[in-house]
Regions:
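Hydrophobic packing and interface segments
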Residues: 1-280
Length: 280
């Protein structure tokens, strides 16, 4: 049996959207990091340590929240507007597209960085100009390469990883949840299998949305406390606010996970709500 042409084109469309999504968030990440680097350098001239810590953290939060929101919106569009018989293939196409885009960006960023390093070294050897000398054009190329390798690649990787794991979870639910073994040993959908699968998929997307909210709220709380504590200090240990951010985010996310899971899937039996909460 041949796959209908409209379905093939739909899958290809979502593959292209996955590639464009990876490229878009990578561009945004590089743009934000460039601004953050410049503003952090100027903020350091004031002699205050807190802005030097808070600006990079804020830029990282903006990149992370944006790429997750874009990913989540695109997956919800597939879930809501693509017919059930085509949604699975579109999810796979989307995951393949963003993986291809992330791979290309990661490789290209690394190659650009290495070429810039080699160029700077050649200038040092041939023209006796140090690799960190402002007269060496490899210095600018190396800075650009580092920005490409450290911004473009990780941002696209984050976008791809978040999407691929979501597709894997949905695939597992569709293929395994709500299924039972028949007398001949084969798997078959239970009477309420569709309802179980739907509830679990809604639960997954709800948890993903709530984790964005808990992350932003945790960042705002930690930033407020850190500013009160370190705002006027000339120097402090940068690991302290970062560690407190990890603790606040973890505790808040765990509490929200268990509470919302109990409300949404608490009646599914076999204490499934707390088992899934522990897993995620």
């Amino acid at each position: 049996n041949q796959t209908p042409l409209p379905m093939v084109m739909n899958i290809l469309l979502w593959s292209v959207l996955g590639i464009l999504g990876s490229f878009s968030v990578a561009w945004f990440g590089m743009r934000i990091n460039t601004y953050a680097n410049a503003r952090t350098a100027f903020a350091s001239l004031k002699g205050k340590a807190f802005p030097v810590m808070s600006l990079p953290l804020r830029s990282g939060m903006s990149i992370g929240v944006l790429l997750i929101c874009v990913e989540l919106v695109m997956m919800i569009i597939i879930l809501l507007f693509i017919p059930r018989e085509n949604a699975g293939a579109c999810f796979i196409g989307f995951a393949i597209g963003e993986s291809l885009g992330a791979s290309a960006l990661r490789i290209c960023g690394g190659i650009f960085t290495k070429i810039a390093d080699i160029g700077a070294d050649l200038m040092k050897i041939i023209f006796k100009i140090d690799e960190d000398d402002a007269r060496n054009p490899g210095v600018i190329a190396d800075c650009t390469g580092d920005n490409a390798g450290d911004s473009v690649g990780p941002t696209a990787d984050g976008f791809e990883t978040y999407g691929v794991t979501g597709v894997a979870l949905i695939s597992f639910i569709v293929l395994a949840a709500g299924m039972s073994y028949t007398d001949n040993g084969s798997l078959a959908l239970m009477a309420d299998g569709i309802d179980i699968q739907a509830r679990l998929i809604v639960w997954i997307f709800t948890m993903r949305l709530l984790m964005i909210i808990t992350s932003v709220v945790s960042y705002m709380i930690n930033n407020w406390f850190s500013k009160l504590r370190f705002g006027n200090k000339q120097d402090f240990d940068f690991e302290v606010p970062l560690t407190s951010l990890v603790w606040i985010t973890s505790l808040l996310s765990i509490a929200v996970t268990f509470g919302v899971s109990y409300v949404m899937i608490g009646g599914m039996g076999e204490d499934l709500w707390w088992k899934l909460s522990v897993i995620i």
